[in-house]
Amino acid sequence: LFCRKGTCHFGGCPAHLVKVGSCFGFRACCKWPWDV
């Protein structure tokens, strides 16, 4: 459920980030490509 070392975004991830999971089920967990 938690997004470790990433950021939570409503909807999709910004173009420069990679989706790696979800935050609390309804938000996207995004990380920088070099942090994935």
UniProtKB/Swiss-Prot annotation:
It comes from Struthio camelus. Disulfide bonds join C3-C29, C8-C23, C13-C30. It is found in: Secreted. The keyword Nucleus does not apply. This is Ostricacin-1. Has antibacterial activity against the Gram-positive bacteria S.aureus 1056 MRSA (MIC=1.25 ug/ml) and S.aureus NCTC 4163 (MIC=6.7 ug/ml), and the Gram-negative bacteria E.coli O157:H7 (MIC=0.96 ug/ml) and E.coli 0111 (MIC=6.7 ug/ml). Does not have antifungal activity against the yeast C.albicans 3153A. One of its GO terms (cellular component) is extracellular region. One of its GO terms (biological process) is defense response to bacterium. Keywords: Antibiotic, Antimicrobial, Defensin, Disulfide bond, Secreted. It holds the Pfam family Defensin_beta. Its main location: secreted. The lineage of its organism: Eukaryota, Metazoa, Chordata, Craniata, Vertebrata. Belongs to the beta-defensin family.
